[in-house]
């Protein structure tokens, strides 16, 4: 039995056969639209699009399979022997500070005084890198040489510095000694001054100390180097400057101890420092002389010892003196004038 719309049946005809109107009424549309209040969505468009989405079949998704790569494969590998050597050097440097370095300019295998192509760099005497080899030492080497300078026997200092003599240690030893001697000298004058208020610092002591110490440490090695060169010995000027610079290291603590205002203590300190440093200097210089020039070597070493003792006496008698000279100015008006006396001759 077909469905009929009985909306208009109140006209008395029960067989009214008007087809059913399947379109929604205005009231139904209003109710459906109320599902989306305060929006711009149209219910008809929403239902139509939803139906189309349900009718669409899902897209075909193929069964993807991924190929696994082995971890042992190096995609950037190069079979050349140079690259293999570079890789080995990078692995060796991985444990060092800074890690691996891809720049060969800073590699440990490249010397500092060479170019990138392996040729030796050339510097002029007025350029700072020209004197770099004079300071090519570290703290450990300098400390070892300072300790050895206070042990005058059982080793050769020239053998220790033969491969790498330096001027770094001697420069700081001499410079420190210049200022310490000047300060100690002024303190001795202050302690033994009768009037501390009128006492003033003597800046000239720094100049005198520099002339004495630098002159002794540069002039005498230069003269000895000329003599040894004339005797065809293998001692270089740099070796002589190095040993004379380290020789005076023991005078640094000795000068500090000379602040003690006791003459006997100061004499003992200066004597010990001069004997230890003098033996260190004489024994090391006499070693290359004793084989072929025994008599000359004894004379040269005697002169070296005498000059070293002279330096110690200058330090003690001039810089570490315990007394200051007090000059008094006499007033000529207060001095009495001599009165003539009558003398008679006895006949």
From Swiss-Prot:
Q: A Gene Ontology biological process annotation?
A: vesicle-mediated transport
State what protein this is by name.
Protein YIPF1 homolog
Report the gene name: yipf1
Sites of glycosylation? Answer: 322, 326, 342
In which family does this protein belong, per the annotation?
A: Belongs to the YIP1 family.
| Bias type Polar residues, positions | 34-47, 105-115
Q: Which PANTHER family match?
A: PROTEIN YIPF
The UniProt GO MF terms for this protein read: small GTPase binding
Keyword Glycoprotein listed? The answer is yes
Q: Where is this region: Disordered?
A: 1-115
Primary site of residence: Golgi
Provide this UniProt record's keywords sorted from A to Z: Endosome, Glycoprotein, Golgi apparatus, Membrane, Transmembrane, Transmembrane helix
Q: Which residues lie on this side of the membrane: Lumenal?
A: 188-207, 254-255, 318-347
One GO cellular-component annotation of the UniProt record comes to: Golgi apparatus
Bilayer topology term: Multi-pass membrane protein
Q: Which Pfam families match?
A: Yip1
| UniProt topological domain (Cytoplasmic) ranges | 1-166, 229-232, 277-296
Q: Where is the composition biased (Low complexity)?
A: 48-67, 76-104
Q: Where in the cell is it found?
A: Golgi apparatus, cis-Golgi network membrane; Golgi apparatus, trans-Golgi network membrane; Late endosome membrane
- UniProt-listed InterPro entries: Yip1_dom (IPR006977), Yip5/YIPF1/YIPF2 (IPR039765)
Which parts pass through the membrane? 167-187, 208-228, 233-253, 256-276, 297-317
> Does the record's keyword annotation contain Flavoprotein?
no
